[in-house]
């Protein structure tokens, strides 16, 4: 082998010339004590609140308590490999997550790392998880419908784009099913609707079983809805800081769409578990407990999260982020601490009841206790025209039904009211995974409030509805198209709709 001295000396001179003198300076501290997912660290004098710090082995944490002599750090992950005396390094960055369309169709953890085994996510942007909500000036009042595909909700408790509508109820009452159906209902718009109408969906699973989350993802995948959805999962086996962070991470991912003039929907399932995780962190950080041992700022925890859902005005891109937070109650107790907090923050609630669920009324929405504080401004005119009377009729029906239990001799008007109410209640039932388009809901409810169901036995209402829908999709397609494009029922359309339902009703008998 031929070694040339001149060549070697040239290489060495080049290496020496390019040798950098600047040392890499990073501020470090020492772990004083560690346990229960909390580390006390000495020496990080300039650390910021909410800053990400790094432990040996790549484990990350977030500085939450900045005290006189040490820093309380919550650890994202297991604290098993961290020991006293370990070096902790500042990263200089407040906790952030990747955002953008690259996340669609993926399942990520609270820090935005993929957990679905489909390879890395090459997101071009990152954003902080905890940012300030839009102020009053950039907002606009909610005026576009956010269709859930569920008759009971779209007709009676309409949700608009940019609204925060709480889904509240005991365990096993169908809270997650409402969010799932709402996500599935967006598929038709994503397949062949205009870009401006598309609704991108984020689903945050907090403290749930992994099997439940896997099932949710499987349903979305099978029905082609995962392509426009992001799943953020902090399951029951994840550390409390991850469960605390997941809703904020999901919200940031949804805000990307809101701020780029698009529409997004986020479901937090559920915020009771986030509050429990936050309580655990706060108590371990020795913050003083308040009511039900929750820290004093648990209201602020949820208010700053839910205030980020907003409808922006045209100068700011006219985007929106709609939130569907879920709260699980114990024994229908809506007056507990966390439920009352979230009810007071949101723009209405969908109240689900165990009794209704077991009576076979599903979705088990208690129409009397559920409200939407945005109301009919979140409905198209056609829906307002047909659903206006159904609310009053159902309210009267509930009132009468309570008295009718005691009296046997009822006058004809009361009997008529009870019959109509029973059929309307039956009409609002809907099987899971079968969301309806708005114009189809309008046709079905129109049949209900115009007396087409009154002669039918209650048991046949569901069959009539299914038959009517398939008839309208084939024979009455023109009427449905008119309702969809005009978004209102003119006298002409009304006559055509009546005729179509009439001709079906004759063949049904």
From Swiss-Prot:
InterPro entries: ATP_synth_asu-like_sf, ATP_synth_asu_C, ATP_synth_asu_C_sf, ATP_synth_F1_a_nt-bd_dom, ATP_synth_F1_asu, ATPase_a/bsu_AS, ATPase_F1/V1/A1_a/bsu_N, ATPase_F1/V1/A1_a/bsu_N_sf
Enzyme class: translocase
Topology in membrane: Peripheral membrane protein
Any one Gene Ontology molecular-function term assigned to this protein's record: proton-transporting ATP synthase activity, rotational mechanism
Catalyses which reaction(s): ATP + H2O + 4 H(+)(in) = ADP + phosphate + 5 H(+)(out)
UniProt-annotated binding residues for ATP: 169-176
Membrane spanning residue stretches: none
One GO location term (cellular component): plasma membrane
Chief location: membrane
UniProt-listed Pfam families: ATP-synt_ab, ATP-synt_ab_C, ATP-synt_ab_N
Site positions (Required for activity): 370
Compartments (UniProt record): Cell inner membrane
Keyword terms, alphabetized: ATP synthesis, ATP-binding, Cell inner membrane, Cell membrane, CF(1), Hydrogen ion transport, Ion transport, Membrane, Nucleotide-binding, Translocase, Transport
EC number: 7.1.2.2
Assembly description: F-type ATPases have 2 components, CF(1) - the catalytic core - and CF(0) - the membrane proton channel. CF(1) has five subunits: alpha(3), beta(3), gamma(1), delta(1), epsilon(1). CF(0) has three main subunits: a(1), b(2) and c(9-12). The alpha and beta chains form an alternating ring which encloses part of the gamma chain. CF(1) is attached to CF(0) by a central stalk formed by the gamma and epsilon chains, while a peripheral stalk is formed by the delta and b chains.
Recorded family membership: Belongs to the ATPase alpha/beta chains family.
Role, per record: Produces ATP from ADP in the presence of a proton gradient across the membrane. The alpha chain is a regulatory subunit.
Protein's UniProt name: ATP synthase subunit alpha
Source organism of this protein record: Sinorhizobium medicae (strain WSM419) (Ensifer medicae)
Gene from which this protein is expressed: atpA
């Amino acid at each position: 082998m031929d070694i040339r001295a001149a060549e070697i000396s040239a290489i060495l001179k080049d290496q020496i010339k390019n040798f950098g003198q600047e040392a890499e300076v990073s501020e470090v501290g020492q772990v004083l004590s560690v346990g229960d997912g909390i580390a006390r660290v000495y020496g990080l004098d300039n650390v910021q609140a909410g800053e990400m710090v790094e432990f040996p082995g790549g484990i990350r944490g977030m500085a939450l308590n900045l005290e006189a002599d040490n820093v309380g750090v919550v650890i994202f992950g297991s604290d098993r490999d961290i020991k006293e005396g370990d070096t902790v390094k500042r990263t200089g960055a407040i906790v952030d997550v990747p955002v953008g369309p690259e996340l669609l169709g993926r399942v990520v953890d609270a820090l935005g790392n993929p957990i679905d085994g489909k390879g890395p996510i090459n997101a071009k942007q990152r954003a902080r998880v905890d940012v300030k909500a839009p102020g009053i000036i950039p907002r606009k009042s909610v005026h576009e419908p956010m269709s859930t595909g569920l008759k009971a909700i779209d007709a009676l408790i309409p949700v608009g784009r940019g609204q925060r509508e709480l889904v509240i109820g005991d365990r096993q009452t169908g809270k997650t099913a409402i969010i799932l159906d709402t996500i599935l209902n967006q598929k038709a718009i994503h397949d062949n609707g205009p870009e401006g109408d598309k609704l991108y969906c984020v689903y945050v699973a907090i403290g749930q079983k992994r099997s439940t989350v896997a099932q949710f993802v499987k349903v979305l995948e099978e029905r082609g809805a995962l392509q426009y959805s992001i799943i953020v999962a902090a399951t029951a086996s994840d550390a409390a800081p991850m469960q605390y962070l997941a809703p904020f991470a999901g919200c940031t991912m949804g805000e990307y769409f809101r701020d780029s003039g698009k529409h997004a929907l986020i479901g937090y399932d559920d915020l009771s578990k986030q509050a429990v995780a936050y309580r655990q962190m706060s108590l371990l950080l020795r913050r003083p407990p308040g009511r039900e041992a929750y820290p004093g700022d648990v209201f602020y925890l949820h208010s700053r999260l839910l205030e980020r859902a907003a409808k922006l005005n045209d100068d700011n891109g006219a985007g929106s982020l709609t939130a569907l937070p879920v709260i699980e109650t114990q024994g229908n107790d809506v007056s507990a601490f966390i439920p009352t907090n979230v009810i007071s923050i949101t723009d209405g609630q969908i109240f689900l009841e165990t009794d209704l669920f077991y009576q076979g009324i599903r979705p088990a929405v208690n129409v009397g206790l559920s409200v939407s504080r945005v109301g009919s401004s979140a409905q198209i005119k056609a829906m307002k025209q047909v659903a206006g009377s159904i609310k009053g009729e159902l309210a009267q029906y509930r009132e009468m039904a309570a008295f009718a239990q005691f009296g046997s001799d009822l006058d004809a008007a009361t009997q008529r009211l009870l019959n109509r109410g029973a059929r309307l209640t039956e009409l609002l039932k809907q099987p899971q995974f079968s969301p309806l388009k708005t114009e189809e809901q309008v046709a079905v409810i129109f049949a209900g409030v115009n007396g087409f169901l009154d002669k039918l036995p209650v048991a046949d209402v569901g069959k009539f509805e299914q038959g009517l829908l398939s008839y309208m999709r084939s024979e009455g397609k023109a009427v449905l198209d008119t309702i969809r494009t005009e978004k209102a029922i003119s006298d002409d359309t009304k006559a055509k709709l009546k005729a179509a339902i009439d001709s079906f009703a004759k063949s049904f008998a």
